[in-house]
Amino acid sequence: MRVAVLPGDGIGPEVTEAALRVLKALDEREGLGLTYETFPFGGAAIDGYGEPFPEVTRKGVEAAEAVLLGSVGGPKWDALPRKIRPESGLLALRKSQDLFANLRPAKVFPGLERLSPLKEEIARGVDVLIVRELTGGIYFGEPRGMSEAEAWNTERYSKPEVERVAKVAFEAARKRRRHLTSVDKANVLEVGEFWRKTVEEVHKGYPDVALDHQYVDAMAMHLVKNPARFDVVVTGNIFGDILSDLASVLPGSLGLLPSASLGRGTPVFEPVHGSAPDIAGKGIANPTAAILSAAMMLEHAFGLVELARRVEAAVAKALRETPPPDLGGSAGTQAFTEEVLRHL
């Protein structure tokens, strides 16, 4: 099982190293046969190769079965043209692998309800996974344009585009609490009608998973009023963009949020947080999101669901007993990782 490691910039190398320590500890005990090769990416690749996603990295990604990514960007490269900034490497990476589904879990860990902006009794038990379609919808639909008098965009989805992201969501729900909520605007938009009908057709292949539908405006309200009711949520590109950001504030810290991007090529697993150049090299970065991204890799790239849950449980215990500085504790990157390993 080959993993391409892209540490990136800022705190990326530090938190990625923490995630690798956890993976290697599991490998030693379970004999997983994981192998790792590190490649330049983002600003680090610009410095060495003049571009954020060089050919050597592209080939490494294509030869791997999963990508573990750190973070990209920083003020050092902000003055560069937009097309060659570190962040453009992310778009190129996703496009090269045809990654059409983004998975963003938002979980309020037991004992950390106080961090959520919601009341503790509302935040308690929140564990929702947002599955967002990444490559279609209004962000990519044609025709699009703007004149002095008007502007226009096109919301468009084909049946295969909806079917494939729906299958990803149903599969994810099957590994969790077996409940999928599909979000659309079927009462106003034909695309929403089409989305709902197609998801219902896909549901026939997953009779063990419960399915319900929500309009996007109602869904935004429910995510604030009663987020614990949801298990897996699937939706289109623009609605997923908004709802995943809304859900991301529920745990109370970006340092807790992993993500996965899945598709036809090599899947990518990365923290939601940025490169945080202000704390890079200080040994205080919270590695939780990177470690949980590694857990998502075990589950979604290699099918090791039980091991992924063990990592999540170890992280939850470490967060409760020895939280890192951004969560009100004092455990630095190394110390927190040691605690995760101890609980693991």
UniProtKB/Swiss-Prot annotation:
SMART domains: Iso_dh. Gene3D superfamilies: Isopropylmalate Dehydrogenase. It is an enzyme of class 1 (oxidoreductase). Its main location: cytoplasm. Coiled coil: none annotated. One of its GO terms (molecular function) is magnesium ion binding. Pathway: Amino-acid biosynthesis; L-leucine biosynthesis; L-leucine from 3-methyl-2-oxobutanoate: step 3/4. The keyword Metal-binding applies. Its cofactor is Mg(2+); Mn(2+). Catalyzes the oxidation of 3-carboxy-2-hydroxy-4-methylpentanoate (3-isopropylmalate) to 3-carboxy-4-methyl-2-oxopentanoate. The product decarboxylates to 4-methyl-2 oxopentanoate. Homodimer. PANTHER family: 3-ISOPROPYLMALATE DEHYDROGENASE (PTHR42979:SF1). This is 3-isopropylmalate dehydrogenase. The gene is leuB.
